[in-house]
Amino acid sequence: MDLSRALKLDATPEGVYGLNMVPAGETTDLDPRSVIEANSRVVTAGAGLIISHPKPAPSFGGQPVFYHDDALVRSVDPAAFATVADGTDAPLSPMPIHDAAFGWATTPHQAFRAKITRADHRAVGGDQLNEAFMIAVLRGLGELADALLLQAILAATPAAFTFGAAAARHAKYDELRALVGTAGTGAEISGDGSFRAKGVLAELTAATDKTVIGLFNRAAVAIRPELSVHVKRLNVNGDTELIVFANAQAVLPNASDFWTA
């Protein structure tokens, strides 16, 4: 399955409709990227979604070589200028550039596996299972993006959120977003009716039990554009097994751009 191309959904039979209510006798294009983005809380919060094909390897003639090509996500802080008295050296400032490299060859594998029985195919809506699984897989990639990035952030044991800490990271208030996990820590409905955590605009996520606040626009998730889909017949009863393999990873240039509630 190629995530960089539109996917065709067949017309629905009479009386059975899918999520986007396709009229009988028509087809519609499903944009994989749009579905993934719509179902990823970290992307909605500002994180980049990288879906791009590997760059073709250059020609090295007849020489045997090992070739590895990495991509880069870079976050750039403002340069720290300081007042310098006459005759003194300029002070050494911290490096304002934060890089995170990744490559498709080293991206981890993720898999989804499901069993489809003959009864599932014969039930009402069974002839739409292919389209339903296609949508489920794309939505699952959105939640996979959430899980990978939030795991990477929490693995760095972020500090407790304060507005002062956000200011120290050159943040604007409008850049900050919060994702409230299953424990609901710090969640509240403000006086204007908006959902917030520690005063920051928030959204719910099932990818963690923690509440993460940060500058998601300074991070990304990379998903390899091809999915490997395997369908296997299990027995003479008509049961089949569906396995989908993906490659995705979080790309986090600077974990200090995130905090917990």
Language model features with spans:
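Internal, well-folded beta-alpha domain core
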Residues: 143-187, 191
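Assembly/oligomerization interface modules of large self-assembling protein complexes
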Residues: 18-108
